[in-house]
Curated annotation (Swiss-Prot):
InterPro entries found in the cross-reference section: GTP-dep_dephospho-CoA_kin
Binding, GTP: D40, V41, V42, D59, E112, E135
Catalytic activity: 3'-dephospho-CoA + GTP = GDP + CoA + H(+)
GO molecular function ontology, one term from the record: kinase activity
Signal peptide region: none
Record organism: Methanocorpusculum labreanum (strain ATCC 43576 / DSM 4855 / Z)
Name of the molecule in the record: GTP-dependent dephospho-CoA kinase
EC number: 2.7.1.237
Keywords associated with the record: Coenzyme A biosynthesis, GTP-binding, Kinase, Nucleotide-binding, Transferase
Pathway, per record: Cofactor biosynthesis; coenzyme A biosynthesis
GO biological process: coenzyme A biosynthetic process
Homology family: Belongs to the GTP-dependent DPCK family.
Function: Catalyzes the GTP-dependent phosphorylation of the 3'-hydroxyl group of dephosphocoenzyme A to form coenzyme A (CoA).
Length: 161
């Protein structure tokens, strides 16, 4: 299990990709691509727009409050435990399995926010990751060599337990 020490959490306040203020603005970027969502609101917005993420990673909360708007989930559902501020081996294994079970929702008991990092390694080049940036909008990241390098660098700030 990787744990992000509290003193390094500031590194994750900046978006990991391009920020859009409205979900409709990202539609041209995900058309015809494998795309994954991390977070309840962004997953809800994708499903409400009639789009089914290849992998949706949710925890039932938004801004630490229960999120009750989720439309009916389609596809396989995997349940994992991933405490806040961590990336567990269980989460990574579920994300890998989810690639073989598309469409799939990974329901996290704990927190899903950091799932973006392992997804950069698991997804193929050209896939897109969408996640919410509180008070800013929606972040879109296209998986490529540079994104993987950025994720790998951020992972150096974690400690292994």
């Amino acid at each position: 299990m990787l744990t992000l020490p509290p003193e390094n959490r500031w590194l994750f306040r900046e978006p990991f990709g391009t920020v859009f203020s409205d979900f409709s603005m990202v539609l041209p970027y995900i058309e015809g691509k494998i795309f994954c969502t991390v977070g309840d609101v962004v997953t809800h917005n994708a499903l409400s727009a009639g789009l089914i993420p290849s992998i949706g990673v949710i925890d039932g909360f938004t801004k630490r409050s229960p999120y009750l708007k989720m439309p009916e989930i389609q596809g396989h559902i995997l349940h994992v435990t991933n405490p806040a501020g961590t990336i567990t081996d269980e989460l990574i294994a579920a994300l890998r399995l989810a690639m073989d079970e598309i469409p799939c929702v990974v329901m996290v008991n704990g927190e899903e926010d950091l799932a973006v990092l392992p997804l950069t390694e698991i997804l193929p080049d050209g896939a897109v990751i969408l996640y919410g940036q509180p008070e800013e909008g929606l972040v879109i990241c296209e998986v490529n060599k540079q994104l993987r390098a950025n994720a790998k660098k951020l992972l150096t700030y974690f400690v292994s337990l």
